[in-house]
Amino acid sequence: MPCAIDNPQRVLANAIVSYLPGNTPYACTTLCAGKDYAYAGVEYGDECYCGTGYVDGVMPPAAELSDCSMLCSGGYYYYCGGSWRMQIYKFT
C-alpha cells in the first residue's frame, strides 16, 4: 500500500517495531522477511514495522501519497512514510 493512515493501535497485526538508524524500504523488508513476517511497513523515517497481516483483516484507510514523503534515516533518496503514515509492503 503506497501510503496508509496508521493509528495508536497500529494497522499491522502482531506488529513488532524496530528503530533503524539506517532505515530504508529495503532494510525494513529484509528485516521482516528474515523474521518470517508477511508484511513490512516504514513510518516516520526510522521506524520499521513487521506484521502478520492487517488488524482484524481490514486494510487501513489510504492517505495522500504526499503524506508519505518523510526521508528515510538510511537513504536520502528513499521515502519512509510520515507522521502516522505508513508505507506497507506485502511479501508474496
Where are these regions (language model features)?
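Peripheral, non-catalytic regulatory segments
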Residues: 1-92
